[in-house]
Amino acid sequence: MEVKIHSKHIDANLKTAMHAMCGYALSRLGISTRLSNNINLNIHMRHAEHEGESYIHDDANSKRPRDFVVVLDHHQMNRDEYGRKLTDTEWGHKILETLGHELVHVKQYLTGELTGGAEAGLYWKGTRFKLEDFRDYFETPYEIEARGRERGLLIGFLVQWNDMQPALDEYLKNN
């Protein structure tokens, strides 16, 4: 898997965690090593309409996509649902959780469950979902799965991350 993170002013430790989260999440979502070795993820940290979005890269094969773009608007992630400012650690966790959510959509594209795009419309297992308003978005099967998996992916990742963090810190200190 090739992961490119395009960002400014993002801590190296968070970037490393984002790389690790990509591998962890796709593995937990049942994507084989063989398939994940052929995936390209371009993660852009920039202003966007939503906190996160993922889509098939314009140049990718739409029938068997392997190139994906994930956009994370980290500027929108500095406050919780109630408007409280997040600490740096909470902000990093929010970024990783949103990345996990978007990687569920990548899995859906890879397995053919989710097809189409913004212009053609999104299809879940062959059924087109026409959204009348934003409330309908949260009722789509692809969003229900992504919302349902995002927290579990974050917690599972953080358990592994905390276990390997001392060894990683030692490695970075010596190299």
Predicted ranges, named:
Residues 2-69:
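Auxiliary, metal-adjacent structural segments of Zn-dependent hydrolase domains
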Residues 48-94, 106-110:
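Active-site scaffold of zinc-dependent metalloenzymes
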Residues 14, 18, 92, 96, ...:
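Hydrophobic (often cysteine-bearing) scaffold residues that line and stabilize catalytic clefts
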Residues 25-28, 107, 149, 153:
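Short alpha-helical scaffold segments that flank and stabilize functional sites
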Residues 93-97, 109-139:
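Post-HEXXH active-site segment of zinc metalloproteases
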Residues 97-110, 146:
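Active-site recognition of the HExxH zinc-binding catalytic motif
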Residues 106-122, 154-165:
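Substrate-binding/catalytic groove segments of enzymes
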Residues 132-175:
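Long, well-structured alpha-helical subdomains associated
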